[in-house]
């Protein structure tokens, strides 16, 4: 347990290091803390903080920098978020395009990266495999294009190969049947109904429709579930730019998205803003990163998560506000878009 003096000095050290990225010495800390303490006293307190694993001395400097544990204590007990510095009115809602749900997600990721100057990530709302409309186009013998339109207006194209050939009139017949009987249903339900009704349909048409239902399910479920924006912002972060190996790993992380998806999925089960410092998430194995996330809702039900990814040396107060307000704006925009 830290006494008040140690807490004030740790808070001042973390804030100073976040501000300029330089190891903090005793003289600088004395000025930053506002405490009338001798350099020797401050050095003794810093030594105690170092023994507790809250700060560390880089090999190249006599100053100290916070550890992940030090940042955690700072975030949990020392933050004083100034709500008047950033408001929902400052982050303008119209840019979220509430009448276009797909743009809400991509615009939110861009807003997060633009406001934070780090990386913005948004996990798209969990999708159920539902189609709104389906069409077939004959490309060549036994080769057809399936055009699938999802409920949110996204269009996916898939090529299928069949054992039998079909005329364009047969393709129209199949698409009309699927659209009139099954549009808006879950793909699994469509598959079951087709299985039950296959005897009432002509065999070759039933086979075509079953193939179409399968590729529709794969197309809808394979869409990117995480939107990432602002990866290049990390090139300007000195904590990363000096280590090209780490940068490559980070860009791989953003490109592959699987680890991001797992982290955001876990975060969606928590209430409010969550902060992962260093390796705390146990999902993203990068000690130098911090992630600030918050879930968003549609009509009161959590459907996804968004957040900011940046260095441990980030202004946490500002990031918390950006993520919190953006999640509320996204929730409002998506709820109004229905």
Curated annotation (Swiss-Prot):
Domain of life: Bacteria
UniProt-listed Pfam families: HrcA (PF01628), HrcA_DNA-bdg (PF03444)
Coiled-coil residue spans: none
GO term, biological process aspect, one: negative regulation of DNA-templated transcription
Alphabetical list of InterPro entries matching this protein: GAF-like_dom_sf, HrcA, HrcA_C, WH-like_DNA-bd_sf, WH_DNA-bd_sf, WHTH_HrcA_DNA-bd, WHTH_transcript_rep_HrcA_IDD
Alphabetized UniProt keyword annotations: Repressor, Stress response, Transcription, Transcription regulation
Single GO MF annotation: DNA binding
Function of the protein: Negative regulator of class I heat shock genes (grpE-dnaK-dnaJ and groELS operons). Prevents heat-shock induction of these operons.
Family, per entry: Belongs to the HrcA family.
Protein name, per record: Heat-inducible transcription repressor HrcA
Gene for this chain: hrcA
């Amino acid at each position: 347990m830290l006494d008040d003096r140690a807490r004030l000095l740790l808070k001042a050290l973390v804030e100073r290091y976040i501000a300029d990225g330089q190891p903090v010495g005793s003289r600088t800390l004395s000025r930053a803390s506002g405490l009338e303490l001798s350099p020797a006293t401050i050095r003794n307190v810093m030594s105690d903080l170092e023994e507790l694993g809250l700060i560390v001395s880089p090999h190249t400097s006599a100053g100290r920098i916070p550890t992940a544990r030090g940042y955690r204590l700072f975030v949990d007990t020392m933050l004083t978020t100034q709500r008047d510095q950033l408001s929902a009115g400052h982050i303008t809602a119209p840019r979220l395009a509430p009448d276009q749900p797909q743009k809400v997600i991509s615009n939110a990721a861009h807003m997060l990266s633009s406001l934070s100057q780090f990386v913005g990530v948004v996990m798209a709302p969990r999708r159920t495999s539902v189609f709104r409309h389906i069409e077939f186009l004959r490309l060549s013998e036994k080769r057809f294009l399936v055009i699938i339109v999802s409920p949110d207006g996204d269009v996916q194209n898939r090529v299928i190969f069949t054992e039998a050939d079909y005329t364009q009139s047969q393709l129209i017949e199949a698409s009309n049947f699927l659209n009139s009987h099954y549009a808006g249903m879950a793909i699994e339900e469509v598959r079951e109904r087709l299985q039950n009704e296959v005897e009432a349909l002509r065999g070759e048409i039933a086979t075509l429709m079953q193939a179409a239902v399968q590729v529709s399910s794969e197309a809808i479920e394979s869409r990117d579930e995480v939107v990432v924006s602002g990866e290049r912002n990390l090139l300007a972060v000195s904590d990363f730019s000096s280590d090209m190996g780490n940068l490559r790993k980070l860009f791989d992380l953003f490109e592959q998205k699987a680890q991001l998806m797992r982290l955001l999925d876990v975060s969606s089960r928590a209430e409010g803003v969550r902060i992962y410092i260093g390796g705390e998430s146990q999902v993203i194995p990068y000690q130098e990163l911090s992630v600030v996330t918050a879930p968003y809702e549609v009509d009161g039900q959590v459907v996804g998560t968004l957040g900011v990814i940046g260095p441990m040396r980030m202004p946490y107060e500002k990031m918390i506000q950006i993520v919190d307000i953006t999640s509320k704006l996204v929730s409002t925009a998506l709820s109004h878009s229905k």
